[in-house]
Amino acid sequence: VASMLYLDYGKKEGEWLPNKFGGNKNLEAIEFFHHLNSVIRGTYPGFVTIAEESTAWPNVTSDIGGEGLGFSFKWNMGWMHDFCEYMKLDPLYRKGNHYAMTFAMSYNDSENYILPLSHDEVVHLKCSMVNKMPGYTADKYANLRVGYTYMFGHSGKKLLFMGQDFGQEREWSEERELDWYLLGEKLNQGVHTYVKELLELYRKYPAMYEIDNTWDGFEWMNADDAEHSTYCFVRKCSSSKNNLLFVLNMTPMKWEN
């Protein structure tokens, strides 16, 4: 989306012309998105449109009009970057980057977000999700499980690219299928079962999805325990008796109290 919204996107000085107001906004692209989203919503109720927008363009998911583009959801690219950078750190050194995992909540209410772990993160020598994780093989899978738990607890809808649900170990390539034989391996079976159980929890408890992208559905209990690399938060729903408490330890250490 960003490459359409900006006239100067990826271009050097002299390679683009400003709009009639002298700016770099592509007014025709904005009008196209207005028309696209209004037609889809009006013709096919229940359909969603999702924007991969990598800049700070505002109101991508706001109602159509002005700068509101009218998309249903926007990929939270910042969350994806921060999550991957944090999770690939050795757990004993994560405390130095503790707030990478809390930063996305500071702008969580600005859009209707999806938390994506997309194909972009598992190509071009970036490694598969499991091989981004530090440690020996078993440690990698343990880190992946706790990372997914954080993802499912965090505000925003979820997107896992194919193979991430069972710990695909090779990078993705459009030239071959996934390594399905891994479903016969114990560690991969464990991740597959774990993701299945996370999805079952997600369906069962409205607190995990009912109030996304506002502070009414999320409350930090402790976002500042960098020394122990722990996070504690509550996901809320309209029925407060069904709120969920998440406590995550991002190290292999045992902490008391």
Regions found by a protein language model. Give the residues of each.
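Aromatic-rich peripheral "rim/lid" segments of glycoside hydrolase catalytic domains that contact
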Residues: S173-E185
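Short acidic catalytic loops
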Residues: V1-L5
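Conserved alpha/beta catalytic core and glycan-binding cleft of carbohydrate-active enzymes
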Residues: G10-E174, R203-N257
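Catalytic cores of secreted or luminal carbohydrate-active enzymes
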Residues: K186-I211
